[in-house]
Amino acid sequence: ASTPTTKGYAEKADHEGEKMAETYGGGDFQYQFVDGWAKLPEGTTFHECPGVAIDSKDNVYVLTRGEHPIIVLDREGNFVRTFGEGHFSNRTHGLYIAHDDSLLIADDGIHTIQKFSSEGEKLMEIGEKNNPAPKWSGQPFNRPTSAAIMPSNGDVYVSDGYGNSRIHVY
């Protein structure tokens, strides 16, 4: 597995500190580790990254549980922006990018799904912040974990995984 460093880069080492293979996969699906790909500004780090997604313009959105909840990089790893500060708990869980490049972010700490534009404008929130449904009640939400949008009709699907074991559809 990759391990974070203080600058937010990754080092190739397995759980015992041994160097990992340079190429992964086989046939038409071979991948190489890119050391030092992410170029973060001084003081910005990846901290507990529970999600990553790529928009239609090849921007990479990294969901973190750190000071900057969303870190945006271009395809070359150059820093673009951060956003989401003040909107999340330290339990962000899932990141999804819709067909229109909007983002859905699950936060099982405050029991919400939040929708943002790709530029960071908050567009919508589903769920009542810090007010979980009774555990196993089937009512939304008790620690939701992920969300997705059906491209054909715009329906939102939410996995309410930890405290409900349900899929809610809006």
What is each model feature region?
Residues 1-3:
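N-terminal export leaders
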Residues 5-19:
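Short, Lys/Arg-enriched N-terminal segments with co-localized hydrophobic residues
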Residues 17-170:
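Eukaryotic scaffold repeat domains enriched in small/polar residues
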